């Protein structure tokens, strides 16, 4: 199973990125949720603008689908500067990064997604650029090679990552501002769904937005994806208006339950409960029981179940929590 194939995957494809771009907020005033982050960024941006300086380099980390790219674009808009976007895997050679840096205007933003995947060679070039706004370039080869320094205009590097722990210490230490994005609560997600519905010209009630939000796993990207599928259902099966009952029927058809679980989430939990008496069960046995790769279980299925308190990893194996039993209306063996 590929994560991107799941309706409730937080990863987004290129086509979805284009659609989401049309409904993204452009300014902090339009950005819903992440209140501590927004409050801090508002102050940092205002101070940098008053001084006429580039904003300090910014690292944004957190689970996928929470709005790291959106926030980077908002920072550029609020600063009134251009943004150039790339990603860690794309920057294979030092020259790739140098080409981007030398084309920046004063105070521009360079946004690097998946910055934890930068190659060591590219990272070495980035250090003096971030610290001194200088670019060290090697001219020629062999004994005749020499290093020259190019001055760069002041700029802001914004790095985004889902794995802050994978960043090297020298790179992480060069960011003056570090922000973590958290999963969204249902209220904020409801507001996001309602705003997206307005941007798409949909007739949606508050309870319809709530129904989509509560099944979106705290993630705006999933909420917007579910909204588009609910729109399709309402268009074909009703008069196009999205209310609570219509949204619930659409979600049931899509096999996304009240907690945002899909078939694979439920299959894993029920395997632990039914086949292994609630656990503990080792990863090898669990993978064989549900017919999935071990990496898929560890990287795709388990994280959300653990975060929400439905599954525990222990030294002896996986254990289903009381909350998992309650979700399926089952009684724990020790309660029988």
Curated annotation (Swiss-Prot):
Specify where the region named Large ATPase domain (RuvB-L) lies, as residue ranges: 4-184
Keyword DNA repair appears in the UniProt entry:
yes
Q: Which GO terms describe its cellular component?
A: cytoplasm; Holliday junction resolvase complex
Stretches the record annotates as Small ATPAse domain (RuvB-S): 185-255
Q: Where does DNA bind?
A: 313, 318
Q: What's its catalytic activity?
A: ATP + H2O = ADP + phosphate + H(+)
Q: What class of enzyme is it?
A: hydrolase
Q: Where is this region: Head domain (RuvB-H)?
A: 258-336
Q: In which residues is ATP bound?
A: 23-24, 65, 68-70, 131-133, 174, 184, 221
**Residues the record lists as binding Mg(2+):** 69
Pfam families hit by this protein: AAA_lid_4, RuvB_C, RuvB_N
Fill in the subunit field for this protein: Homohexamer. Forms an RuvA(8)-RuvB(12)-Holliday junction (HJ) complex. HJ DNA is sandwiched between 2 RuvA tetramers; dsDNA enters through RuvA and exits via RuvB. An RuvB hexamer assembles on each DNA strand where it exits the tetramer. Each RuvB hexamer is contacted by two RuvA subunits (via domain III) on 2 adjacent RuvB subunits; this complex drives branch migration. In the full resolvosome a probable DNA-RuvA(4)-RuvB(12)-RuvC(2) complex forms which resolves the HJ.
Q: Which family does it belong to?
A: Belongs to the RuvB family.
The job of this chain, per UniProt, is described as: The RuvA-RuvB-RuvC complex processes Holliday junction (HJ) DNA during genetic recombination and DNA repair, while the RuvA-RuvB complex plays an important role in the rescue of blocked DNA replication forks via replication fork reversal (RFR). RuvA specifically binds to HJ cruciform DNA, conferring on it an open structure. The RuvB hexamer acts as an ATP-dependent pump, pulling dsDNA into and through the RuvAB complex. RuvB forms 2 homohexamers on either side of HJ DNA bound by 1 or 2 RuvA tetramers; 4 subunits per hexamer contact DNA at a time.
Please identify the protein, giving its name as recorded: Holliday junction branch migration complex subunit RuvB
Organism of origin: Aeromonas hydrophila subsp. hydrophila (strain ATCC 7966 / DSM 30187 / BCRC 13018 / CCUG 14551 / JCM 1027 / KCTC 2358 / NCIMB 9240 / NCTC 8049)
Q: What is the lineage of its organism?
A: Bacteria, Pseudomonadati, Pseudomonadota, Gammaproteobacteria, Aeromonadales
């Amino acid at each position: 199973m590929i994560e991107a194939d799941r309706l409730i995957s937080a990863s987004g494809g290129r086509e979805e990125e284009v659609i989401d771009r049309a409904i993204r907020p452009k300014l902090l005033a339009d950005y819903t949720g992440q209140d501590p982050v927004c409050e801090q960024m508002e102050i940092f941006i205002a101070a940098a603008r008053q001084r006429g300086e580039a904003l300090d380099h910014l690292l944004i980390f957190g689970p996928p689908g929470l709005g790291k790219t959106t926030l980077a674009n908002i920072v550029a808009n609020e600063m009134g500067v251009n943004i150039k976007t790339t990603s860690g895997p794309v920057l294979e050679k030092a020259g790739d990064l140098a080409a981007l840096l030398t084309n920046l205007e004063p105070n521009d933003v360079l946004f690097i997604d998946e910055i934890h995947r930068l190659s060591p060679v590219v990272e070495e070039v980035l250090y003096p650029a971030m610290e001194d706004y200088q670019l060290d370039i090697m001219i020629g080869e062999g004994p005749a090679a020499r290093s020259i320094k190019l001055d760069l205009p002041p700029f802001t590097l914004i790095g985004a990552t889902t794995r802050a722990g994978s960043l090297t210490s020298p790179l992480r230490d060069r960011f003056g501002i570090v922000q973590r994005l958290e999963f969204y609560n249902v209220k904020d997600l409801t507001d996001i769904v309602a705003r997206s519905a307005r941007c798409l010209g949909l007739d949606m009630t508050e309870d319809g937005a709530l129904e989509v939000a509560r099944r979106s796993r705290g993630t705006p990207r999933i909420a917007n994806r579910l909204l588009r599928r609910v729109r399709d259902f309402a268009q074909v099966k009703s008069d196009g208006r999205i209310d609570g009952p219509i949204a619930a029927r659409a979600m049931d058809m899509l096999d996304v339950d009240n907690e945002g679980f899909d078939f694979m989430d439920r299959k894993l939990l029920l395997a632990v409960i039914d086949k292994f008496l609630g656990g503990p069960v080792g990863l090898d046995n669990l993978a064989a029981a549900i017919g999935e790769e071990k990496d898929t279980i560890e990287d795709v299925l388990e994280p959300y179940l653990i975060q929400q308190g439905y599954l525990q990893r222990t030294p002896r194996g996986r254990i289903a929590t009381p909350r998992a039993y309650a979700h399926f209306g089952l009684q724990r063996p020790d309660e029988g």
